[in-house]
Amino acid sequence: MRKTITARLIWLPLCAMAQQWKANGMSAEEVTPKGWQYSVAEGDLNKDGVSDIVVLATPNHAENLKTRDDGYVYNFNTPELAIYLGQKGGGYNCWKTYDNVVPPRPDEYNSIDATISITPRGVLSISLEHFSSAGGWGNTTETFLYRYQGKDFFLIGEDEETMARNTGEAEKISRNYLTNRCQRIKYNVFNDKVKPKETWSKMKKEPLKKLGE
């Protein structure tokens, strides 16, 4: 079954949240709330010739932390995404911050590994790898591609790749919202003798969704 992500846009003055993101700064470390674990992607998102940064950070609010008997700490806080546009004179200004674009870890047995990157063409890629340590053999990775156009970021494509860890059977579904075409490939990770099966289909044309919708 295809997973969906419900995203809610948080856009407050100067990127303010319960614990504030800084309105501007010279680096990802400087703008990210202190103590939050974060990753950063760098590239030119708005095609102005100046490098921008996207920061994905997980809060450390104590009420959403749980310590295991062996000392390992589960973090159930919801990650936050912040986009900072580079300035020609140096540094970055906060453009928008988003809450719930990336879902939190659901429980002790299921995790979501989120990664962000910016392609050479300035497309923001958000990948979510769902992993279950108990109760199932399936792995799912979702990748969402957003492009800056018309003064906002719009979803232009997404991939969904599933794999059974016990059999190696896998399927990848790629949706292109610019061409309205869908590619589906079935293959086997463990057996090269199994020939991949590829099919294409048309999708209904719909308005592009904004990041955060």
Language-model features: locations:
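Signature of short aromatic-glycine-proline-rich micro-motifs recurring in repeat-based ectodomains
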Residues: 36-40, 110-116
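Acidic, small-residue rich beta-repeat scaffolds with periodic aromatic anchors
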Residues: 113-213
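Blade-edge motifs of beta-propeller repeat domains
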Residues: 19-33, 88-108
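Acidic/hydrophobic-patterned starts of short beta strands in beta-sheet-rich repeat architectures
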Residues: 45-57, 119-128
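Repetitive beta-architecture junctions, highlighting loop-to-beta-strand starts
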Residues: 38, 79-81, 141
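Beta-propeller blade repeat segments, especially FG-GAP/WD-type strand-to-loop junctions
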Residues: 62-98, 146-148
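N-terminal targeting signals for Sec/Tat export/insertion, comprising classic cleavable signal peptides
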Residues: 27-53
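Bacterial Sec-dependent N-terminal signal peptides
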Residues: 1-21
